[in-house]
Amino acid sequence: LPKQRQTLLFSATYEKNIEKLASNVLLNPVVVKVENEEKVHIKQKFYSVEESNKTTLIPALISSNKAKSILIFCNMKITCDKLADDLYNLGLDVLTLHSDLEQKQRDETIILFSNKSYPILIATDVASRGLHIDDVDLVINYDLSLDEKIHTHRIGRTARAGKGGMAISLYTYNDFDRVELIKDTFRDIEDESIDKIEDDLSYKIDSELRTIFINGGKKQKLRAGDILGALTAGIGLHKDEIGKIDILDFASYVAISKEKISFVLEKLSKEKIKGKYYRIYEKWQNKKGDINCLKIHYFLK
């Protein structure tokens, strides 16, 4: 590096390794630290459970909190997949996110969860940092985190954008030491009995949205307004029937009211978007975590 230079270093955290790097490359730096402007409101509850009872508690925890967007953390990939299978067999729509998935699969999984097409995401700690998903109203630590720093990042996925959130941690007899370490960091943790969980059997854990895939994106100069126009002025959807629109380099994803999904797949395949026809799929994830095309509709001219 030249001796005369201006260097700026930005980091979301300032741990020892970053501090060491900074001391080697920065010249008499001015350090600016930005604190949170708003107090984060996360209510934490801890439940002592038997390992064999964890899975059956999940639906009750969701219904008792009237949660619509749920992020469940496991320590191992195999636990994620097993829990996903079990919840799927209980009739719940779930996604999985861990390091065995390719980057494209991860991206699509995050899109399907963040646009509310799936209510439940089961993940390892690959999802605890760097994700910006609004409106996650319940975090469940199916496995207690390995340390208090990981716990902090996990529960930070809820209560974003100034909103409140709930974080629930399940722990067994073997986790007592880690529970005490976490409690030393967080003074407002409530120990609860599973007997006090009020399971609302009438509560339906479901999504009102589904996702369509369009094989065109930023590289084709597609914009959200182009897709919105094709859906509303083009085929007659109401804006309330359209959710989040995500546009990547070569693909676009649109959340659609599930009552309208068949209509959209049929009609949009015959409607030009910005003067061109595109292939239209419905996107979904199977129990193995693979993102699939449930229905394929395309119109070529």
Locations of regions flagged by a protein language model:
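Conserved RecA-like helicase motor-core motifs
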Residues: 31-33, 71, 88-102
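Conserved segment of the helicase C-terminal RecA-like domain
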Residues: 157-192
